From Swiss-Prot:
Protein name: Leucyl/phenylalanyl-tRNA--protein transferase
Organism: Burkholderia ambifaria (strain MC40-6)
Gene3D superfamilies: Leucyl/phenylalanyl-tRNA-protein transferase, C-terminal domain, Leucyl/phenylalanyl-tRNA-protein transferase, N-terminal domain
EC nos: 2.3.2.6
Catalytic activity: N-terminal L-lysyl-[protein] + L-leucyl-tRNA(Leu) = N-terminal L-leucyl-L-lysyl-[protein] + tRNA(Leu) + H(+); N-terminal L-arginyl-[protein] + L-leucyl-tRNA(Leu) = N-terminal L-leucyl-L-arginyl-[protein] + tRNA(Leu) + H(+); L-phenylalanyl-tRNA(Phe) + an N-terminal L-alpha-aminoacyl-[protein] = an N-terminal L-phenylalanyl-L-alpha-aminoacyl-[protein] + tRNA(Phe)
Entry GO MF terms: leucyl-tRNA--protein transferase activity
Family the UniProt entry places it in: Belongs to the L/F-transferase family.
Pfam families cross-referenced by the UniProt entry: Leu_Phe_trans (PF03588)
Function: Functions in the N-end rule pathway of protein degradation where it conjugates Leu, Phe and, less efficiently, Met from aminoacyl-tRNAs to the N-termini of proteins containing an N-terminal arginine or lysine.
UniProtKB keywords: Acyltransferase, Cytoplasm, Transferase
C-alpha cells in the first residue's frame, strides 16, 4: 500500500518504495500537494515527483538510480566537432537561467518516444519556477543566431545537481547544453548528476546505475555542502574539447 501524505506528513523511508515485482517500482508515496517546501524536502532525500494530469502527486525513489558522473561523460568524435564549432563561432551561445520557464515549456512540448502527453504540467512548472526564483533550480540553454534551440533544467542543492528534462529543436542542441553543464560541474568538482531513470541515451553519454543506498548517502553529504556558483558560459567547453579552433575561411567547412 502506497502511503498518502497529508500536508504535514513526512516522507516515509525510501526503503519502503515499491519493489521491482510491482507495477510501479520505486513509487514511494502520493499526495495532493506540490508545495515548494514539500519539493525541497523531497530532493534533499533523493525523492522526485513524476505524475500525469488527473493523477495525485506521485513521489518516487527508484532502485537502482541512474546517475552521470561528470568525470565519466562521454564525448563522441562528432559531438567534439560540434562543441569546437560552438566555441569558435560567435553565433553560438550557451546561456544560464536566461529563460527558465521557456525551457520548461519547451521540455513539456517535446515529443517523447513511447509517451503520450507530458508529466511537466502547469503545476510542475509553477513549483519548479518557485525553486528557480529561490536559486535552487537552473536552466542551461543552447542559443544560435539569437534563438533558443535546446536546453535542460534541473534542481541544485549544495554540491548536487538533479537533472529533470531536456529538449532539442536542432541536432545536438540538448547535448551542447548538457556538455556545458558537465564542464562547469567538473570545474567545480561535483561528483554526480542525478538522472533518475535509465535510458539508452543517457547510457551512451556515460550514465550508469548505482544502488539507491549509495545514491541517497551521496545526496545526504552533497546537499550539506555550500552551493556552487551558477554563472558560466560556453568557454568552459574548452575543458572537454581542447582549445577552440580558429574560424575557417569563408566558404570552407571543417
Amino acid at each position: 500500500m502506497v502511503p498518502w501524505l497529508g500536508p504535514d506528513d513526512p516522507f516515509p523511508p525510501v526503503e519502503r518504495a515499491l519493489g521491482p515485482a510491482t507495477g510501479a517500482p520505486g513509487l514511494l508515496a502520493a499526495s495532493a500537494d506540490l508545495l515548494p517546501s514539500r519539493l525541497i524536502e523531497a530532493y534533499l532525500r533523493g525523492i522526485f515527483p513524476w505524475y500525469s494530469d488527473g493523477q495525485p502527486v506521485l513521489w518516487w525513489s527508484p532502485d537502482p538510480r541512474m546517475i552521470l558522473a561528470p568525470a565519466e561523460f562521454k564525448v563522441s568524435p562528432s559531438l567534439r566537432k560540434t562543441l569546437r564549432r560552438v566555441l569558435r563561432e560567435p553565433a553560438w551561445e550557451v546561456r544560464v537561467d536566461h529563460d527558465f520557464a521557456g525551457v520548461m515549456r519547451a521540455c513539456a512540448q517535446a515529443p517523447r518516444r513511447g509517451q503520450r502527453g507530458t508529466w511537466i504540467t502547469a503545476e510542475i512548472i509553477d513549483a519548479y519556477t518557485s525553486l528557480y526564483r529561490s536559486g535552487n533550480a537552473h536552466s542551461i540553454e543552447t542559443w544560435h543566431d539569437g534563438r533558443r534551440i535546446g536546453g535542460l533544467y534541473g534542481v541544485a542543492f549544495g554540491r548536487m545537481f538533479f537533472g529533470e528534462s531536456m529538449y532539442a529543436d536542432a541536432t545536438d542542441a540538448s547535448k551542447i547544453a548538457l556538455a556545458t553543464l558537465v564542464a562547469h560541474l567538473r570545474e567545480q568538482g561535483l561528483e554526480m548528476i542525478d538522472c533518475q531513470q535509465n535510458t539508452s541515451h543517457l547510457a551512451s553519454l556515460g550514465g550508469r546505475e548505482i544502488a539507491r543506498k549509495a545514491f541517497v548517502a551521496h545526496v545526504r553529504r552533497a546537499v550539506a555542502e555550500p552551493p556552487i556558483p551558477w554563472q558560466f558560459d560556453k568557454r568552459v567547453l574548452a575543458a572537454l574539447t581542447g582549445p577552440a579552433e580558429p574560424a575557417a575561411p569563408s566558404g570552407i567547412e571543417r
